[in-house]
């Protein structure tokens, strides 16, 4: 898929083996990263991790500043990049506020879609192809509503089976995140152009430099805590995230009615191994925040908190 990524990208740094400059989506360096974000990168290097100036390049392991999809000082979304510039084309119709109810078939080939709009059912048929891009929840829901999925399960709901494909909806994955938040006596006011998470670290928990990362840290200026938190407003936040994990969730149908929301089971933290990786990640984040790079911040931990030290206490926090 790399050629398609390059084709879609307008990389501020210029063209390379992994980046393109002729695409629609603007990708840039941070306009004004907070000085504390660079300190996070320095802390990672201090603990033995490599600097990585390009997470979307030849390798992902290491620490560095993230890039952003920004254009003219504003977020450059996929809609702004790909859709809005061509919305006047005569061969393009954009319909909003519509609910796709099922795919239309000719034998086992998808030839169109049926959708509900303003209380009326409509059908659109195509000569070429239908691209199903409805997200992690609605894509499997739509496939199953259309008869693609576990045949026995669909038949129980009264749905005619087109293709028996038991794996549909059975591979739901989501990153589990936990935060370490520290207060500081210094002002760390992020620029209004900040994307919140400015720096990061990709690492392999087993220390294998050739293996794919199974953990990721996000770091940014500012205190990110649940709403209703009453405390200091100067600080920084590190987020521990699992990029590979054992527990897989599922999406299943509540009924054969497209208007019924699907049943979503995330299965978060059902694996002890995943929980222990998060515990280890919190300990590593704390070690980074206690490194020389952060010495002059006179900071104290807000979350999980100085009294949360044992594995059991950290597991309870998670």
Go through each PLM region and give its residues.
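Glycine-rich loop(s) and the adjacent beta-strand/alpha-helix scaffold that form part
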Residues: 103-192, 255-256
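General small-molecule cofactor/ligand-binding pocket signal
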Residues: 52, 93-95, 160-164, 218
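FAD cofactor-binding and catalytic pocket of flavoenzymes
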Residues: 176-283, 287, 312-318
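Short, glycine/acidic-rich hinge or "gate" loops at secondary-structure transitions
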Residues: 296-306
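Conserved redox-cofactor binding core of oxidoreductases
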Residues: 2-110, 116, 179-183, 190-192, ...
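Internal hydrophobic alpha-helix adjacent to the cofactor/substrate pocket in enzyme cavities
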Residues: 44, 157-160, 280-294
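Generic recognition of stable, solvent-exposed alpha-helical segments in well-folded globular domains
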Residues: 35, 39, 81, 137-141, ...
